[in-house]
């Protein structure tokens, strides 16, 4: 993302750590803009971006493995502060002349370190708890470096070259298990890099609107409206930037929540005076999905069909060159990067055909979900719309496990409406990050009245989270869960059992498919 010259930037280089997005997230929480880029970024690109600081993320590899990730050592000569985290510290040590070796056993979990530094650890207790996760260890630091923290298991828990402003820590300050991790990152960003912390959603809007106007010119844009928070925010942002050059295409694929289609037309078509075309493509999608049970295949089919529908609609319009989507940072990450294994393909980034005729515009693909909500409020979208439940592009298609049928969709649609109603009545909307029902491909025996039943099981998924990268199951009061269960079993046909998902992310993802 191209930033205005006055915008402070902390550049995070990705070496494949499962935590690397958290680094970016923590820095943004300080009001400083941060981006995650591949470790192969060139020196020229870095100079052009003009970051105030560079952070080298952790990673699962050893610095001595064949083909292990590395960087251009010239990074250390740019005069820009550098902080290496775990793998980033080991790589820094190796590239600058120190020594690293394979540890006898992997160090994983909490550890106590003792610190001594007036920069990274300024204002922090000398003894603190951190989260270790590494298999290599530093045995000799480069010339010019000093030890600023040690632990019972390592003499080099943190190091610094204060003159060149190069630092390394053998633990993960970005995870919440590290007691003063945010404070350490804040010291690096504020004290070492001298960032003022002026990144706001207001700034983001100004920059993004200018980018959109420069790129689009007098051409036209189609926006994929799904009814979810992300695509709604994208539509309003684009409308603010280019007005009537925007045409929103709302594809009603028959996989929407109860009442979703009418709500979209009323709130955005009438409320924001947008040009929205509603396309009834239910039969088209259902025919494509008939007999398909594999979740990845379902996502690909839905993503492809979305684009083909857009193609059909665009052919009826003149001068449409761009397709806008509500892709988030987490969507891009979960679809896999050079250093990250694909967890699941996201329909916005993984299902697009190679011969697609549109150029993509993804104006919020560097934002996390909570940042998108803040952006929505700043854009003037009513709170009740901004705080609507996240809804994936494939819709209920990935909340019906296995093959999709009309009857199964109706079960999920009605049970989900009951869940959302009870959560709202109990005042839990803001406490729970995301909640929805799923229909596993499971039937079980039950008794209703005097009769034996053999019907469907509905699963409830409700999680708490800050940014969607990690989550835990919500501790909903048992009486509330009982109310939800009772209503679903009594009001939704062909359901005789309700279960509650008590799994965190990781190891599970929030969605079941």
Curated annotation (Swiss-Prot):
Keyword Nucleotide-binding among UniProt keywords: yes
Pfam families from the UniProt entry: GATase (PF00117), GMP_synt_C (PF00958), tRNA_Me_trans (PF03054)
Catalytic residues in the record: 86 (nucleophile), 172, 174
SUPFAM superfamilies per UniProt: Adenine nucleotide alpha hydrolases-like, Class I glutamine amidotransferase-like, GMP synthetase C-terminal dimerisation domain
InterPro entries with a match to the protein in the record: Class_I_gatase-like, GATASE, GMP_synth_C, GMP_synth_GATase, GMP_synthase, GMPS_ATP_PPase_dom, Rossmann-like_a/b/a_fold
Keyword terms: ATP-binding, Glutamine amidotransferase, GMP biosynthesis, Ligase, Nucleotide-binding, Purine biosynthesis
GO cellular component, one term: cytosol
Residue ranges constituting the GMPS ATP-PPase domain according to the UniProt record: 199-388
E.C. number(s) listed in UniProt: 6.3.5.2
Catalytic reaction annotation: XMP + L-glutamine + ATP + H2O = GMP + L-glutamate + AMP + diphosphate + 2 H(+)
Cysteines engaged in disulfide bonds, as pairs: none
Annotated positions binding ATP: 226-232
Alphabetized CDD domains for the sequence: GATase1_GMP_Synthase (cd01742), GMP_synthase_C (cd01997)
The Glutamine amidotransferase type-1 domain, residue ranges: 9-198
Subunit structure: Homodimer.
PANTHER family the UniProt entry points to: GMP SYNTHASE [GLUTAMINE-HYDROLYZING], GMP SYNTHASE-RELATED
HAMAP family reported for this sequence: GMP_synthase (MF_00344)
Known function: Catalyzes the synthesis of GMP from XMP.
Protein name: GMP synthase [glutamine-hydrolyzing]
Encoding gene (name): guaA
């Amino acid at each position: 993302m191209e930033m205005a010259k006055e915008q402070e930037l902390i550049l995070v280089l990705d070496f494949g750590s499962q935590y690397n997005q958290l680094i970016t997230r923590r820095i943004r929480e300080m009001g400083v803009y941060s981006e995650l880029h591949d470790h192969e970024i060139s020196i020229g690109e870095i100079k052009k971006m003009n970051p105030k600081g560079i952070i080298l993320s952790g990673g699962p590899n050893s610095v001595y493995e064949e083909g292990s990730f590395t960087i251009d050592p010239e990074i250390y000569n740019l005069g820009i502060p550098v902080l290496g985290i775990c793998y980033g510290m080991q790589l820094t040590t190796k590239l600058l002349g120190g020594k690293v070796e394979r540890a006898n056993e992997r160090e994983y979990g909490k550890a106590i370190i003792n610190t001594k530094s007036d920069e990274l650890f300024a204002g922090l207790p000398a003894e603190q708890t951190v989260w270790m996760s590494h298999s290599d260890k530093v045995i000799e630091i480069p010339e010019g470096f000093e030890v600023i923290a040690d632990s019972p298991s390592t003499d080099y828990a943190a190091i610094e070259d204060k003159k060149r402003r190069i630092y390394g820590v053998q633990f993960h300050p970005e995870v919440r298990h590290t007691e003063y991790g945010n404070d350490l990152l804040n010291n690096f960003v504020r004290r070492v890099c001298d960032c003022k912390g002026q990144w706001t959603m207001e700034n983001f809007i100004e920059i993004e609107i200018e980018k959109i106007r420069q790129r689009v010119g007098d051409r036209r844009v189609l926006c994929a409206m799904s009814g979810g928070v992300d695509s709604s925010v994208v539509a309003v942002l684009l409308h603010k930037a280019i007005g009537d050059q925007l045409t929103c295409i709302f594809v009603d694929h028959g996989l929407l929540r109860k009442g979703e289609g009418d709500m979209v037309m009323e709130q955005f078509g009438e409320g924001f005076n947008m040009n929205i075309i509603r396309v009834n493509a239910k039969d088209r999608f259902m025919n494509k999905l008939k007999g398909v049970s594999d979740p990845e295949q379902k996502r690909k089919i839905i993503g492809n069909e979305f684009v083909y529908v857009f193609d059909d609609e665009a052919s009826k319009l003149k001068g449409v060159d761009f397709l806008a989507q509500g892709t988030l940072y987490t969507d891009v990450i979960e679809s896999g990067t050079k250093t990250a294994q694909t967890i699941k393909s996201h329909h916005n980034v993984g299902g697009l055909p190679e011969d697609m005729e549109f150029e993509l515009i993804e104006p919020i693909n560097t934002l996390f979900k909570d940042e998108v909500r803040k952006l929505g409020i700043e854009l003037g979208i009513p709170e009740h719309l901004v705080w609507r439940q996240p809804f994936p592009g494939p819709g209920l298609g990935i909340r019906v496990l296995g093959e999709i049928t009309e009857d199964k969709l109706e079960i999920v649609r009605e049970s989900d409406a009951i869940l959302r109603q009870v959560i709202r009545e109990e005042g839990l909307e803001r406490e729970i990050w995301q909640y929805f029902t799923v229909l596993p491909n499971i039937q079980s025996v039950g008794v209703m009245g005097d009769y034996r039943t053999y019907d469907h099981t509905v699963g409830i998924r409700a999680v708490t989270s800050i940014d969607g990268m990690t989550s835990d199951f919500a501790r909903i009061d048992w009486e509330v869960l009982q109310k939800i269960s009772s209503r679903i079993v009594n009001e939704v046909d062909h359901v005789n059992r309700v279960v509650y998902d008590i799994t965190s992310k990781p190891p599970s993802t929030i969605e079941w498919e």
